């Protein structure tokens, strides 16, 4: 009969008279007791079920030990719990909570998939599978908001942003990017915001090679988003926001033909600098008079050489004043088809786009969006979709608990407070009992969320 080796440590702590003995001797315990909230969210959305349904299993049925849905859920829930590597599978193989997340018996159920199994799964996915996965992800998110809002959506804002994903191996399509001064990928992220709500809901993630136009893949992504949004929310106005890296002639013409609102950053040039010169002079005078930063707004009509028409340009003439430093000019430009006053367009309708940086930070630092270390490009795209799917679970959980102090918290805070809970699992014939710490500081918030998710 095999016996498990029990790890034990003895500590002598100053001020405590007795030695402290720490034993890792609880086989039916886990440190991820709160992850059941994420499973409840997944059941409400049907997210992993839809994603798994988009995959085609080409394996011989009689030899399959781990269904694709289980492997997909193992990766998504693992990322959500902070386990970014496939190598973590060996450490979690017998974790009772992670078995429970896959609908297995937490004590006697089969072990989770191994690292080689997960790696084969990631590298077996093809282009068609990824397209269906991306479509299923968008459909799941938008359908949930259709059920939540009904006909109440009047404005839907689509935010686009990209970032660098440094690579450190021989990954496919990882190229040197001079702007970021590194070998990298350039993942693109898209979010939707409904009406004046503060949450930017992530709906798509697209991995792109390390070089090329910043608008690569944008029109195809937007075309599919426009179609789905107009089907689900026929009365809503669509608005696109993005920084200056996306303001090229083809994308602007595409947005005009699509009949959507847009407000995009625009890089400065000599012609625009001449247009803003007078406004900037007034801002300099105001800054000299008050000794504080001065900001003025104006507008003009402008067409770059490759544009097919003139467009409205919002100009911000700003002079920055900091104690002990020389004053600094900071002119900025936007291109838009919105009719609002220049100051309103810039401060109220465009600046909210900057919160996309937080979405990127959460995905990179909290959900390992940049863990793209597979040799195959398509496998890395799959990993990106897994991170986005895990983020959708967290965003939905935060939407449910918006009234609590956790509603606006970032991913790692929610994970530390709601997911990382020590638990002892007990199973009887009739039920499974999770024994959680009585002194858990976020007990009330956890119970409130669990009760809400258990409701109709």
Annotate the PLM regions:
Residues 365-368, 378-381, 403-419, 437:
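A glycine-rich phosphate-binding loop feature that marks nucleotide/adenosyl-phosphate handling sites
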Residues 163-165, 208-210, 267-269, 320, ...:
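Short, glycine-/Ser/Thr-/acidic-enriched flexible segments
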Residues 212-271:
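Domain-level cores of phosphate- or acyl-group-handling catalytic modules
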Residues 41, 74-75, 86-89, 114, ...:
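Short, conserved catalytic/metal-binding motifs centered on acidic residues
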């Amino acid at each position: 009969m095999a016996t498990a080796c029990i790890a034990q440590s003895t500590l002598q702590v100053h001020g405590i008279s007795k030695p402290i003995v720490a034993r890792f001797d609880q086989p039916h315990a886990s440190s991820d007791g709160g992850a059941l909230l994420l499973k409840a969210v997944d059941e409400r959305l049907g997210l992993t079920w839809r994603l798994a349904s988009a995959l085609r299993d080409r394996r011989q049925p009689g030899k399959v030990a781990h269904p694709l849905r289980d492997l997909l859920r193992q990766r998504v829930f693992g990322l959500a719990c902070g386990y970014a590597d496939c190598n973590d599978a060996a450490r979690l193989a017998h974790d009772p909570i992670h078995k429970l997340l896959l609908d297995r018996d937490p004590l006697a159920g089969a072990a989770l998939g191994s690292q080689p199994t997960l790696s084969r799964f990631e590298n077996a996915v093809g282009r068609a599978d990824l397209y269906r996965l991306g479509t299923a992800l968008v459909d799941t998110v938008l359908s949930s908001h259709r059920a939540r809002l009904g006909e109440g959506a009047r404005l839907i804002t689509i935010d686009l942003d990209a970032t660098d994903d440094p690579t450190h191996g021989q990954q496919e399509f990882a190229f040197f990017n001079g702007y970021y001064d590194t070998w990298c990928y350039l993942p693109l992220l898209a979010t939707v915001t409904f009406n004046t709500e503060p949450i930017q809901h992530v709906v798509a993630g697209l991995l792109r090679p390390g070089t090329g136009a910043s608008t690569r893949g944008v029109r195809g992504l937007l075309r599919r988003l426009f179609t789905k949004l107009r089907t689900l929310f026929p009365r809503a106005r669509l608005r696109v926001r993005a920084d200056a890296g996306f303001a090229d002639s083809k994308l602007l013409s595409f947005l005009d033909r699509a009949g959507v609102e847009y407000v995009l950053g625009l890089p400065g040039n000599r012609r625009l600098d001449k247009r803003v010169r007078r406004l900037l002079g007034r801002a300099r005078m105001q800054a000299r008079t008050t000794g504080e930063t001065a900001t003025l707004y104006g507008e003009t009509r402008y067409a770059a050489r490759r544009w097919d028409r003139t467009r409205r340009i919002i100009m911000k003439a700003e002079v920055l004043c900091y104690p002990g430093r020389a004053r600094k000019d900071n002119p900025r430009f936007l291109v838009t088809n919105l009719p609002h006053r220049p100051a309103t367009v810039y401060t109220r309708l465009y600046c909210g786009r900057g919160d996309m940086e937080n979405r990127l930070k959460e995905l990179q630092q909290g959900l390992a969006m940049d863990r793209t270390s597979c040799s195959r490009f398509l496998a890395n795209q799959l990993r990106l979709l897994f991170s986005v799917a895990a983020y959708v679970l967290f965003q939905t959980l935060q939407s449910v608990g918006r009234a609590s102090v956790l509603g606006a918290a970032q991913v790692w805070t929610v994970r530390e407070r709601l997911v990382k809970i020590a638990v002892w699992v007990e199973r009887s014939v009739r039920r499974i009992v999770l024994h959680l710490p009585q002194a858990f500081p976020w007990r009330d918030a956890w119970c409130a969320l669990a009760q809400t998710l258990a409701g109709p």
